[in-house]
C-alpha cells in the first residue's frame, strides 16, 4: 500500500499528534523521552493517552482515531487500510513470550481438554496460542485478572502477558508452555508481539518525522536507563525495580530501535500463518515506514 504525499507544514504552525499506548512498563520506558519532553520536535506537539492493549486494538479496528497507536500484531490486518506499521517501537520475544500457566503441572497437549483464560482475541498471544493448537477452548478475561481466576479455580489454565511472565511462579502456578520458545523452535524466528501503527493519511513527511521522534525517544531511554526506569516504575504492576528492569530489558532493546530484516520477516510469517490457518480472515498486507 502506498503512502500519500504530504505538503510541507506552514511556517510557525504546530501539528498536534495523538499517541496511544499501554500503561505497561516497557511502553512507558520507550515513550519516556517524548512523554517528558526530553525529545522535542519543532512544529509538532504530542499528546499521550494510556489504555490497555485490547482496548487500543479494538479502537483502531473501529476507526483511525489516534495518529499513532500501540497495537498487537494480530490486530494489524483488521486496520491495515488506515494504518501502516512503524519500523521502530516493537516488542519481540527472543525465544520467550506469552505463557500458558496452570495451578498444577500439565503437558501442553492437555490444554485441548480445558478452557483457557485469554487476555483478548486480538492479542498476538491469542493468535500464537491458536496457531499452536486451534482446538483449545478460550474465554476472554482481563489480563490482570487471569492469575487470580486460575488461583480461584475458575479456569484450569490461563494465557499470561505483560509482567505476569515474571511473577506467575510466585503465585504457585506452573508453566505449561512458553509460546515464544515454541515459536522459535518451530520457525527459528523471534515472536513479534506488539508494535506501533501510524495513520496512513498523515503522509510521508510526518511519517518520517514521527518515526524519528519515537526512535530518538527509545534511544534516549536506553541511554538514560535509570531515569527512564524510574519513570516506568509508576506503571509497573506488582514489580519491584529489579523485576521491572528485567521486564523492560526483555522487550525494549536494539530490536525496538529496528526490527531487523528477520524481525520484519517474523511479522509477515506470523500473520500469513494466521491467515492460512483460518484464524485471520483478512489477507495481511504488511508494510513499514521509517
Which role does the model predict for each range below?
Residues 14-36, 98-156, 163, 265-268:
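Bilobed "Venus flytrap"/periplasmic-binding protein-like clamshell domains
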Residues 264-267, 272-290:
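Long, low-complexity C-terminal extensions of enzymes
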Residues 17-18, 82-91, 115:
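A structural signal for short loop-to-beta-strand junctions that line the ligand-binding cleft
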Residues 203-273:
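Secondary-structure end/capping motifs
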Residues 52-54, 60-77, 142-143, 160-166:
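Beta->alpha turn/N-cap motifs
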Residues 39-50, 132-145, 280-286:
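A local structural motif
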Residues 144-234:
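Pocket-lining segment of extracytoplasmic ligand-binding domains
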Residues 85-108, 131, 184-201:
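Hydrophobic/proline-rich hinge and linker segments of small-molecule sensing/allosteric domains
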Amino acid at each position: 500500500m502506498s503512502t500519500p504525499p504530504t505538503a510541507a507544514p506552514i511556517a510557525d504552525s504546530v501539528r498536534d499528534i495523538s499517541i496511544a499506548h499501554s500503561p505497561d512498563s516497557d511502553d512507558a520506558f520507550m515513550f519516556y523521552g517524548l512523554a517528558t519532553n526530553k525529545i522535542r520536535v519543532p512544529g509538532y506537539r504530542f499528546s499521550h493517552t494510556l489504555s490497555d492493549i485490547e482496548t487500543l486494538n479494538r479502537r483502531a479496528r473501529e476507526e483511525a482515531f489516534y495518529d499513532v497507536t500501540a497495537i498487537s500484531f494480530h490486530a494489524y490486518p483488521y486496520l491495515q487500510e488506515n494504518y501502516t506499521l512503524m519500523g521502530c517501537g516493537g516488542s519481540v520475544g527472543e525465544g520467550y513470550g506469552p505463557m500458558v500457566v496452570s495451578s498444577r503441572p500439565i503437558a501442553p497437549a492437555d490444554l485441548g481438554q480445558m478452557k483457557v483464560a485469554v487476555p483478548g482475541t486480538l492479542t498476538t498471544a491469542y493468535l500464537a496460542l491458536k496457531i499452536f493448537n486451534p482446538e483449545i477452548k478460550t474465554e476472554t478475561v482481563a489480563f490482570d485478572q487471569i492469575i487470580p481466576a486460575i488461583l480461584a479455580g475458575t479456569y484450569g489454565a490461563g494465557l499470561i502477558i505483560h509482567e505476569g511472565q515474571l511473577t506467575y511462579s510466585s503465585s504457585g502456578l506452573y508453566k505449561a508452555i512458553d509460546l515464544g520458545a515454541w515459536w522459535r523452535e518451530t520457525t527459528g524466528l523471534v515472536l513479534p508481539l506488539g508494535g506501533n501503527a501510524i495513520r496512513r493519511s498523515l503522509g510521508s513527511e510526518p511519517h518520517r518525522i514521527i518515526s524519528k521522534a519515537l526512535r530518538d525517544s527509545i534511544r534516549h531511554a536506553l541511554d538514560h536507563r535509570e531515569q527512564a526506569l524510574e519513570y516506568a516504575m509508576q506503571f509497573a504492576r506488582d514489580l519491584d525495580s529489579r523485576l521491572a528492569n528485567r521486564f523492560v530489558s526483555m522487550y525494549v532493546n536494539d530490536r525496538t530501535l529496528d526490527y531487523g530484516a528477520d524481525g520484519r520477516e517474523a511479522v509477515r510469517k506470523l500473520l500469513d500463518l494466521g491467515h492460512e490457518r483460518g484464524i485471520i480472515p483478512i489477507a495481511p498486507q504488511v508494510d513499514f515506514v521509517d
